[in-house]
């Protein structure tokens, strides 16, 4: 009996995580098909997994950033600036791609009444104001509410202050970071069980029937995100590292994108991305900052959602859109997307802001938001998968470009276990 339990534990904690997630996905679909009532009860497993990730992620970011900065040695290289440039470029190109897709495949919405009481920001300045307020938030509130801008600000500040501390204190911060990292590894190994619960309960509850009426706009959204993930981002990676980008792209989509697709939370996927960077032997001083930063501002998927749904509303109302206005919308969508993580409801609640460019009333814009909510089962999942996998993709890209030794031993060649 003990041997059987030991085998199960070894399989769960030492087997291939990707294969286990795939098994959980298939099992979830089968359960939802064969026993939908039982599948609905499995939502507890998914909710527990997401709650566990959201619980450990803020603490993980805090201690890793603080420890890496506190223990940073003079002359030790980090690569945050080029990663930040890639984040912003990719978000703008994603919005631009969405504009082109909207012109080539115009969508028409059947606008519905939305009864929800929503409070979207009125202009871009309000979005930026919200981000700045988050930066100076109370540190305890930032940890409790998962405010990663505030967490980053306090972690960076304390890390800089602790640079002047004794070696013993610095070692303590590193030991604490290692302890939290080990705890996170245990949570990540439970991903197959969590995804099994999420998939089975979601399919059993919705059956994807709500998606049928909005299939066209959904296909444009998903197609655009796939194009960015498989064409635009690889081109950016190739420009940076001057070699075949697809082994790295596929590894990031497989390791990070699949998990993010089902958790539907960039914040919850931070530990997954951190673990992937660690397995790739990337610079911890770099990825401990770039991954949580990416979860906050690298929002290509959000830029696509804002752009396509806004232009769908414009097309529905028969408004003409010229190229300069479309380019301006791309820029606005990119800026709005960078603030999406600081707005309750994310990218959908920023659609009225983009709609205001075209003089669309708030009432009509909210009906577009309602459409987004209806297709959110797939839209939000695909958006999060693109956003989160791109975080680790660009972090790895810059690290590889600046350290050729990483090319000889990438994750794509050591992904058997």
UniProtKB/Swiss-Prot annotation:
Keyword field contains Transit peptide:
no
User: Care to name a GO molecular-function term for this sequence?
Assistant: neutral L-amino acid:sodium symporter activity
Fetch the SUPFAM superfamilies from UniProt: Proton glutamate symport protein
How the protein sits in the membrane?
Answer: Multi-pass membrane protein
Highest taxon in the source lineage: Bacteria
Which compartments does it reside in?
Answer: Cell inner membrane
Identify the GO cellular component terms for this protein.
Answer: plasma membrane
Which stretches are transmembrane? 21-41, 49-69, 83-103, 142-162, 193-213, 218-238, 291-311, 331-351
Give the record's keywords alphabetically.
Answer: Amino-acid transport, Cell inner membrane, Cell membrane, Membrane, Symport, Transmembrane, Transmembrane helix, Transport
Has keyword NAD? no
One Pfam family of this chain: SDF
Give the reactions, separated by semicolons, that this protein catalyses.
L-serine(in) + Na(+)(in) = L-serine(out) + Na(+)(out); L-threonine(in) + Na(+)(in) = L-threonine(out) + Na(+)(out)
Task: Specify where it is mainly localized.
Answer: membrane
Cite the InterPro entries for this sequence.
Na-dicarboxylate_symporter, Na:dicarbo_symporter_sf, Ser_Thr_transp_SstT
GO BP of this protein: serine transport; threonine transport
**What is its biological role?**
Involved in the import of serine and threonine into the cell, with the concomitant import of sodium (symport system).
Matching entries from HAMAP family are given as: Ser_Thr_transp_SstT
PANTHER family per the UniProt record, alphabetical: PROTON/GLUTAMATE-ASPARTATE SYMPORTER, SERINE_THREONINE TRANSPORTER SSTT
The protein's name is Serine/threonine transporter SstT
Organism, per UniProt? Proteus mirabilis (strain HI4320)
């Amino acid at each position: 009996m003990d041997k059987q339990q030991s085998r199960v534990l070894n399989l769960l904690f030492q087997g291939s995580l990707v294969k286990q997630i795939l098994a959980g996905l298939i099992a979830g679909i089968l359960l939802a098909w064969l026993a939908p009532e039982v599948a609905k009860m499995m939502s507890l497993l998914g909710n527990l997994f997401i709650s566990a990730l959201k619980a450990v992620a803020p603490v993980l970011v805090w201690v890793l950033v603080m420890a890496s900065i506190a223990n940073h040695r003079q002359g030790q290289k980090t690569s945050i600036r080029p990663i930040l440039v890639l984040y912003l470029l990719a978000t703008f190109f994603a919005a631009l791609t969405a504009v082109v897709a909207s012109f080539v495949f115009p969508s028409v919405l059947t606008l519905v009444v939305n009864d929800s009481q929503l409070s979207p920001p009125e202009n871009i300045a309000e979005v930026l104001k919200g981000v700045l307020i988050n930066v100076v938030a109370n540190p305890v509130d930032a940890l409790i509410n998962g405010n990663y801008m505030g967490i980053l600000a306090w972690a960076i500040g304390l890390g800089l202050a602790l640079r002047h501390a004794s070696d013993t204190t610095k070692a303590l911060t590193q030991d604490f970071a290692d302890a939290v990292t080990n705890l996170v590894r245990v949570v990540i190994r439970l991903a197959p069980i969590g995804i099994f619960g999420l998939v089975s309960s979601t399919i059993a509850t919705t059956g994807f029937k709500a998606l049928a009426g909005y299939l066209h706009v959904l296909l444009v959204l998903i197609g655009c995100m796939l194009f960015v993930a498989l064409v635009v981002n690889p081109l950016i990676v190739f420009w940076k590292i001057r070699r075949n980008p697809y082994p790295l792209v596929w590894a990031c989509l497989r390791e990070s994108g699949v998990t993010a697709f089902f958790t539907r939370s960039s914040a919850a996927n931070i530990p997954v991305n951190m673990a992937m960077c660690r397995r790739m032997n990337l610079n911890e001083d770099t990825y401990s900052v770039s991954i949580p930063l990416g979860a906050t501002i690298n929002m290509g998927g959000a830029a696509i959602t804002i752009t396509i749904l806004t232009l769908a509303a414009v097309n529905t109302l028969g408004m003409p859109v010229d190229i300069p206005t479309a380019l301006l919308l791309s820029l606005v969508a990119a800026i709005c997307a960078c603030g999406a993580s600081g707005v309750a409801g994310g990218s959908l609640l920023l659609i009225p802001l983009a709609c205001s460019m075209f003089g669309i009333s708030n009432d009509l814009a909210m009906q577009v938001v309602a459409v987004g909510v209806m297709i959110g089962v797939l839209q939000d999942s695909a958006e999060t998968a693109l956003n989160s996998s791109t975080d680790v993709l660009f972090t790895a890209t810059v690290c590889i470009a600046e350290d050729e030794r990483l090319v000889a031993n990438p994750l794509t060649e050591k992904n058997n276990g």
